[in-house]
Swiss-Prot record:
Organism the protein comes from: Phasmahyla jandaia (Jandaia leaf frog)
Keywords, in A-Z order: Amphibian defense peptide, Antibiotic, Antimicrobial, Secreted
Function: Has antimicrobial activity.
Primary location recorded for the protein, binned into one broad class: secreted
Keyword Secreted: yes
Any one GO cellular component localisation term in the record: extracellular region
Cell location: Secreted
Protein name: Dermaseptin-J10
Annotated GO biological process: defense response to bacterium
Tissue: Expressed by the skin glands.
Amino acid sequence: ALWKSLLKGAGQLVGGVVQHFMGSQGQPES
């Protein structure tokens, strides 16, 4: 179904954002 594809894409996007924030917190650039 189309909604399943959209949900999967949204899940991957959220996962990437979470990993990005976790990495940023681990190594602050400022």
